[in-house]
Amino acid sequence: MVEIDPFEMAVKQLERAAQYMDISEEALEWLKKPMRIVEVSVPIEMDDGSVKVFTGFRVQHNWARGPTKGGIRWHPAETLSTVKALATWMTWKVAVVDLPYGGGKGGIIVNPKELSEREQERLARAYIRAVYDVIGPWTDIPAPDVYTNPKIMGWMMDEYETIMRRKGPAFGVITGKPLSIGGSLGRGTATAQGAIFTIREAAKALGIDLKGKKIAVQGYGNAGYYTAKLAKEQLGMTVVAVSDSRGGIYNPDGLDPDEVLKWKREHGSVKDFPGATNITNEELLELEVDVLAPAAIEEVITEKNADNIKAKIVAEVANGPVTPEADDILREKGILQIPDFLCNAGGVTVSYFEWVQNINGYYWTEEEVREKLDKKMTKAFWEVYNTHKDKNIHMRDAAYVVAVSRVYQAMKDRGWVKK
């Protein structure tokens, strides 16, 4: 795999899209840099009485369109470059689906598997104490991400509320919370559900009837599992392959996503699932399928393997699974890509719905959430697809044009840039 600096990749994608826009050089230079970067030391007492200091980040890329929004990642290999890149991509993600937000992202360099639950709670609360003055319902709204979850969001929300002495709508400071403290119905499946809506619309654009067509899903975490499950249940597709970090499985007659999940929980991996053939993650990407959904990690489709991709639609459920060089190859092959910050925007869209519900103190049914998400994702897909057709440019570039144009307009209307 080619090692590419994540933030350099984000800037490269922006520069590429700028070729198709009438955007001033000063605005472009501004958009290449986050507006705020916070690095903090997060000391906590460990269960054995010792004190350990962790490094944390919070990056706010651009708030021209509203408060910044983005998850908090706990990962042993977390880097500032990754957090900056993800905050930048969040700006485009919230803009492409027309949410009144900017992009943010947070992270802590930690292996949470090495912490007890009590240590995790201390870390969550200590992080909020370190960054509370730069977050808030009207400023920057975190959410769960890699190795963080609703329970951790609950602790963080409670710590923020304690510090602020319960002034204002504290529930709205963080999304992805447990239902009992302001969480939203539909949040758990939101990323995958949004991706399914875009896959459905992409098939319409290509004139493909998805019923009985084949899909392969790389990655079997929350997003990967629900993408497979909903593709089967809502679109009538045949799930022929799935994988996790240890490898994948293939059955041309179809897999039952629920049974595979049960197997993974019992055995730690999808590998060796009865009735399926073990395959590598690399082999999964190159299968003869109609839809390929990379839902795991960054940079899995590169210039080295892009020419071997056989899917008609590549739905980027993960962040950054296709490199810029591979983008060109896939387009030359006539493959329709649903770019990551459009395809996986369902999660942040339902996070926005959660925030709206928190601010108003009124909660929607799961069906209402799904209907509102469908409208948002469908509208966003066709805005991007029509831009792609009108300008004869790549779908990712089209998504950037739609998103960056909205941010650029907000910057001009605020008087930040004159042209």
Swiss-Prot record:
NCBIfam families documented for this protein: GdhA_Arch (NF040817)
Keywords noted in UniProt: NAD, NADP, Oxidoreductase
Signal peptide interval: none
Gene Ontology biological-process annotations: glutamate catabolic process
InterPro entries per UniProt: Aminoacid_DH-like_N_sf, GLPV_dehydrogenases, Glu/Leu/Phe/Val/Trp_DH, Glu/Leu/Phe/Val/Trp_DH_C, Glu/Leu/Phe/Val/Trp_DH_dimer, Glu/Leu/Phe/Val_DH_AS, Glu_DH, NAD(P)-bd_dom_sf
Quaternary structure, from the entry: Homohexamer.
GO molecular function: glutamate dehydrogenase (NAD+) activity; glutamate dehydrogenase (NADP+) activity
Identification of the protein by name: Glutamate dehydrogenase
Catalyzed reactions: L-glutamate + NAD(+) + H2O = 2-oxoglutarate + NH4(+) + NADH + H(+); L-glutamate + NADP(+) + H2O = 2-oxoglutarate + NH4(+) + NADPH + H(+)
Family: Belongs to the Glu/Leu/Phe/Val dehydrogenases family.
Organism: Thermococcus profundus
Entries under SUPFAM superfamilies matching the protein: Aminoacid dehydrogenase-like, N-terminal domain (SSF53223), NAD(P)-binding Rossmann-fold domains (SSF51735)
Catalytic residues, chain numbering: 105
